[in-house]
């Protein structure tokens, strides 16, 4: 039986952990060096609920320089991972300000999984000290859940690519969401 093919696109601010999350899931190794993304695609096989799914993983660059290029990733998307970093309250603020409007515009009706990356930094002392200097604190789980509700996300999950905690769960949930969407002949994302 042929595998079911689904397309996942990951979005979020630059340096919020998108590429690391994809690399840890698809290659099971954590990249120690930060390399800003242009566009990288991976394919990963995942089994959920007894179904074999070939998940095409589309990485995107969060930096503003790529705002005009990023929409090229959106056509025929089945599920969106919308990421922020737990050590960056500003990246959470950009979820309703920037990412939700962009995704809803290009991918109406595509399920969104809101993902809090870098969970391991929530209790990291040096991270907390740095944030305190700016009168901020790491994003709390309830803030993430409230945001997921606000943007009408399919689900809210937290993970750490570094420790691998929660990583598989993110992709299993995303795959389930993608499988639930019944595509019309022309459905999916549109580029206008």
Curated annotation (Swiss-Prot):
The keyword Electron transport does not apply. Residues 190-192 form a propeptide. GO terms for biological process: small GTPase-mediated signal transduction. SMART domains: RAB, RAS, RHO. It is found in: Cell membrane. PROSITE patterns: RHO. GO terms for cellular component: plasma membrane. A lipid is attached at residue 189 (S-geranylgeranyl cysteine). Its main location: membrane. GTP binds at residues 12-19, 59-63, 117-120. GO terms for molecular function: GTP binding; GTPase activity. Keywords: Cell membrane, GTP-binding, Lipoprotein, Membrane, Methylation, Nucleotide-binding, Prenylation. CDD domains: RhoA_like. The modification Cysteine methyl ester is found at residue 189. InterPro entries: P-loop_NTPase, Small_GTP-bd, Small_GTPase, Small_GTPase_Rho. Disulfide bonds: none annotated. It is a lipid-anchor. A motif (Effector region) lies at residues 34-42. PANTHER family: RHO FAMILY GTPASE (PTHR24072). Belongs to the small GTPase superfamily. Rho family. This is Ras-like GTP-binding protein RHO. The lineage of its organism: Eukaryota, Metazoa, Spiralia, Lophotrochozoa, Mollusca. The gene is RHO.
């Amino acid at each position: 039986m042929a595998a079911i093919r689904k397309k996942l696109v990951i979005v979020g601010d630059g340096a919020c952990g998108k590429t690391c999350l994809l690399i840890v899931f698809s290659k099971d190794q954590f990249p120690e060096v930060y390399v800003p993304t242009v566009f990288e695609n991976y394919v990963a096989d995942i089994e959920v609920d007894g179904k074999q799914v070939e998940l095409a993983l589309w990485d995107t660059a969060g930096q503003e320089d790529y705002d005009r290029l990023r929409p090229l990733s959106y056509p025929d998307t089945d599920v969106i991972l919308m990421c922020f970093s737990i050590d960056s309250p500003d990246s959470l603020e950009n979820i309703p300000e920037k990412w939700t409007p962009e995704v809803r515009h290009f991918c109406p009706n595509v399920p969104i999984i809101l993902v809090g990356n870098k969970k391991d930094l929530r209790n990291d002392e040096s991270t907390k000290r740095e944030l305190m200097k700016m009168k901020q604190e790491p994003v709390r789980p309830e803030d993430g859940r409230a945001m997921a509700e606000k943007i009408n996300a399919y689900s809210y999950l937290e993970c750490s690519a570094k420790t691998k905690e929660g990583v598989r769960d993110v992709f299993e949930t995303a795959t389930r969401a993608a499988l639930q969407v019944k595509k019309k002949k022309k459905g999916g994302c549109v580029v206008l």
